Amino acid sequence: MDFQLSEDQRDLRSGVREFCEGRFDRDRMRALVDTAPVPGMVDRALWKELAETGFFSLRVAEEDGGVGLGVAEAALVYEEAGRVLLPGPLVATHLAASLPGDLGTDAASGVAVVGLVDGDVWPLLIEHLDALDALLVLTDEGIRLVDPSAVQGVPVGHPVDPFTPVTAVDELPAGELVADVATAEQWRRIGAVLTGALQLGIAGRLTEMATQYAKEREQFGRVIGGFQAVKHLCAEMLVRTEIARAAVYAAAVTLDDPAVGDPEVAVLTAKIMGDDAATKNGKDATQVHGGMGFTWEVDVHLYLKRAWVHATQFGGAEENEEALAATL
């Protein structure tokens, strides 16, 4: 496979990075977690802006009002979202935008905030429940649409990621079947790749943060980046990030053109390597920052916590590794 980005893809990534850094910079990110009246709340104005840039309609056909691109381009966009810790059910709303009818239109345009949960794993942990306009449930029968206002649950008092409020739910209304089993399976694959792309963005940003700190922090009369142990940590972070990048890009290309490889193997590998890079880089970045890395004021812990949350979505490490082993 050729992973060299086309000029259009480079322009897309550059434009999305400029938008993300301009509309959700560090000051806004910290304000959301430090001073927001409701921690982890979905900013509806920002959600609409994301929709206007094509975050949710990227893969919707042009004749249906979308951008008409593929999973490869979506992965580039979601990698950038991961770099700045954009909050909210981004992947779920992106997937919902492909549905026919009003829900798909509302998701694509940013009118609706849509959640997604795998109905085979109990008890359910539903993210952003209070902010949702619709909840989609992946089941053995396909995809069911549930009214989130009819869902009863217990909010988790201190969620791992302060940007991601979670509600524990023991049962769900039956809802309405809106898509078949094949669509549900395809959503699982695309969702895993886009979540892997978010993890790739997190891993890359953590590498940048650690190396920048290592260049600036002085100890014993020299910058700590000159010490071999710190060099090795930063180098290992970069290697993990680039391995994850290759895996995520390969999976995205494979979903766009299954003839180039085995989609199941590619998707599982992308999610495994993305999760591994993000979570391990979070731990190594904390170590590079020393005692400062454990403080609330340094952003490393926010990236690590988000990585832990993503690592539970679309299959955890053990589940995905067993599934990958079964294909060999």
List the model feature ranges, each with a label.
Residues 1-84, 187-328:
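Alpha-helical interface subdomain recognition
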Residues 85-94, 98-208, 212:
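FAD-binding core of flavoproteins
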